[in-house]
């Protein structure tokens, strides 16, 4: 009888216990938590289910909802039981500090990705610094300079492919992803899949629009993970000898020669590191260049492209010669184009939380003068997507205006595509090099019909025009870690004409 009663009442007891636990948790979070004093919607501070609803049920909408909450509650906001979000860019350097100020990642946000072995997914400050130190030399400005010939070769392959595809439709997000994937695979493993030169291989370079479907993302990255793990395994067991044929060391052969302890050179950790390197090095740069391609070919931007082409014609009188990256970086209009690509393309849209484990961060609301003490150990974030579209910083923020960077060089501090601080994106110099060289190669030789006679050498190979592509094909409508466009998008498509 007692056993039977216990068996039948146990579910009820567990349910009551769960309800009481949740009530106590809600009460603590609302009234006694160190974050209870901060502004925000009460339900957001009570439970993660509020964020879950906006990000999972509504598909990547919490970033946009946070922006709306800031309009109501002010520049500092509690967005879940443990995290604060700040919309004030002047506080950016406090959140993403440099030098010897410790900043950890928040394990709650990095654990679900399954990339804790990578530099980007490493939470503790000291472990992150150790892992990053092994990779820093490969991504330094000086070492990326040594890669410029390889990048230029890939850009030339892309131009040659455009010549072959005259009067055909090309998905430039595929074409750019093929190019960036070739480059990062070469630098990582010494292997060149030659995707940039072949239409049928380009679509396998992690196509961007697949990100509009979660199931496709899972399948895509699982397949890529198996391939990358095998690449790392071959490096570990010594069967990959491709690096011996390269003038520059590959990243993962170099890691094996580094001073990292043996446990940091195990297969699973290096495979996670490699997957992040390949994925980010392929998708992000390809997407921001694709966004730039749209804007340079969009209706009403004829004078913009003409200005760019005239600058490139002066800087590159003979396009058959190798391109000099240092010379390109000095071109003001090309630099403005690159930065507008980064601002409107974003690269990543997810919040990148930072924890100051041993500091109380002090934030002063510029509107009210109220001072907020942020307790040590609190995850704090700021969204680059919000800053890049802030009309108080970027006038007419939805417009692609390269001139803004020439008119106001101080805008540089608000360009947050690669984050900042001690955890800034490792690949920043590689991404910049790819963008400068590829955009210069393409638009030195291709223009558009409407631009009229050129002031420079008449060696144009042809014209580019958009094909059934609209502005909405470039706009971020959901935060899926990277920007996701509307579900019906066919990508950013162009047509090559004579």
Swiss-Prot record:
Presence of the UniProt keyword Signal in the record: no
Origin superkingdom: Eukaryota
Q: Which PANTHER family match?
A: CYTOCHROME P450, N-ACETYLTRYPTOPHAN 6-HYDROXYLASE IVOC-RELATED
Q: What function does the entry list?
A: Cytochrome P450 monooxygenase; part of the gene cluster that mediates the biosynthesis of the asperterpenoids, sesterterpenes that exhibit anti-tuberculosis activity. The first step of the pathway is performed by the sesterterpene synthase astC that possesses both prenyl transferase and terpene cyclase activity, converting isopentenyl diphosphate and dimethylallyl diphosphate into geranylfarnesyl diphosphate (GFPP) and further converting GFPP into preasperterpenoid A, respectively.
By sequence similarity, the record places it as follows: Belongs to the cytochrome P450 family.
Q: Which organism is it from?
A: Talaromyces wortmannii (Penicillium wortmannii)
What protein am I looking at? Cytochrome P450 monooxygenase astB
Q: Which reaction does it catalyse?
A: preasperterpenoid A + 4 reduced [NADPH--hemoprotein reductase] + 4 O2 = asperterpenoid A + 4 oxidized [NADPH--hemoprotein reductase] + 5 H2O + 5 H(+); asperterpenoid A + 2 reduced [NADPH--hemoprotein reductase] + 2 O2 = asperterpenoid B + 2 oxidized [NADPH--hemoprotein reductase] + 3 H2O + 3 H(+)
**Transmembrane segments annotated in the record for this chain:** 7-27
Which molecular function term from Gene Ontology is one that the record holds?
iron ion binding
What does the record give as cofactor? heme
* This protein's encoding gene: astB
Compartment(s) of residence: Membrane
Query: What are the record keywords, sorted?
Result: Glycoprotein, Heme, Iron, Membrane, Metal-binding, Monooxygenase, Oxidoreductase, Transmembrane, Transmembrane helix
Its practical application is:
Asperterpenoids A and B, but not the final product asperterpenoid C, exhibit potent inhibitory activity against Mycobacterium tuberculosis protein tyrosine phosphatase B with IC(50) values of 3 to 6 uM.
User: Which Pfam families does the entry link to?
Assistant: p450 (PF00067)
Is the keyword Cytoplasm in the record?
A: no
Q: Which InterPro entries match?
A: Cyt_P450, Cyt_P450_CS, Cyt_P450_E_grp-IV, Cyt_P450_sf, Cytochrome_P450_monoxygenase
Annotated membrane topology is:
Single-pass membrane protein
Q: What is its main location?
A: membrane
User: Which residues are modified by glycosylation?
Assistant: 237, 248, 346
């Amino acid at each position: 009888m007692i056993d039977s009663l216990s068996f039948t009442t146990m579910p009820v007891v567990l349910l009551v216990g769960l309800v009481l636990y949740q009530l106590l948790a809600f009460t603590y979070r609302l009234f006694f938590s160190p974050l209870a004093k901060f502004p925000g919607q009460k339900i957001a501070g009570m439970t993660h289910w509020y964020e879950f609803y906006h990000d999972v049920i509504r598909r990547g909408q919490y970033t946009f909802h946070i922006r709306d909450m800031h309009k109501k509650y002010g520049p500092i906001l509690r967005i879940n039981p443990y995290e604060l979000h700040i919309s004030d860019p002047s506080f950016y350097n406090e959140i993403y500090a440099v030098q010897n100020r410790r900043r950890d990642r928040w394990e709650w946000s990095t654990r679900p990705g399954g990339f804790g072995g990578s530099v980007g997914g490493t939470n503790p400050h000291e472990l992150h610094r150790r892992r990053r130190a092994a990779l820093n030399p490969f991504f330094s400005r000086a070492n990326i300079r040594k890669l410029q010939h390889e990048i230029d070769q890939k850009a030339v392959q892309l131009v040659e492919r455009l010549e072959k595809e005259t009067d055909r439709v090309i998905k430039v997000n595929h074409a750019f992803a093929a190019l960036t994937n070739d480059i990062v695979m070469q630098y990582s493993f010494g292997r060149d899949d030659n995707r940039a030169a072949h239409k049928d291989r380009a679509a396998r370079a992690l196509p961007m629009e697949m990100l509009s479907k979660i199931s496709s993302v899972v399948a895509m990255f699982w397949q890529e993970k198996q391939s990358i793990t095998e690449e790392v395994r071959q490096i570990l067991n010594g069967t990959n000898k491709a690096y011996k044929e390269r003038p520059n060391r590959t990243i993962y052969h170099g890691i094996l020669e580094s001073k990292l302890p043996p446990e940091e050179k195990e297969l699973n950790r290096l495979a996670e590191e490699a997957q992040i390197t390949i994925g980010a090095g392929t998708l992000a740069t390809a997407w921001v260049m694709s966004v730039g391609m749209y804007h340079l070919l969009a209706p009403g931007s004829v004078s913009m492209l003409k200005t760019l082409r005239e600058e490139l014609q002066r800087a590159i009188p003979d396009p058959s010669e190798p391109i000099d990256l240092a010379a390109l970086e000095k071109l003001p209009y090309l630099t403005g184009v690159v930065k507008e690509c980064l601002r409107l393309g974003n690269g990543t849209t997810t919040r990148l939380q930072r924890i100051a484990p041993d500091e109380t961060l002090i934030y002063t609301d510029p509107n009210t003068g109220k001072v907020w003490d942020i307790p040590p150990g609190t995850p704090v974030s700021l969204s680059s997507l919000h800053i890049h579209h802030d009309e108080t910083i970027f006038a007419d923020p939805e417009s692609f205006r390269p001139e803004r960077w020439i008119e106001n060089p101080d805008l540089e501090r608000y360009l947050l595509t690669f984050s900042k601080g001690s955890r800034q994106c490792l690949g920043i110099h590689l991404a910049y090099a790819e963008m400068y060289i590829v955009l210069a190669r393409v638009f030195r030789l291709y223009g558009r019909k409407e631009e009229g006679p050129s002031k420079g050498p008449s060696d144009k190979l042809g014209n580019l025009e958009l094909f059934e592509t609209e502005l909405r094909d470039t706009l971020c409508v959901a935060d899926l870690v990277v920007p996701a466009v509307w579900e019906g998008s066919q990508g950013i498509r162009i047509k090559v004409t004579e």
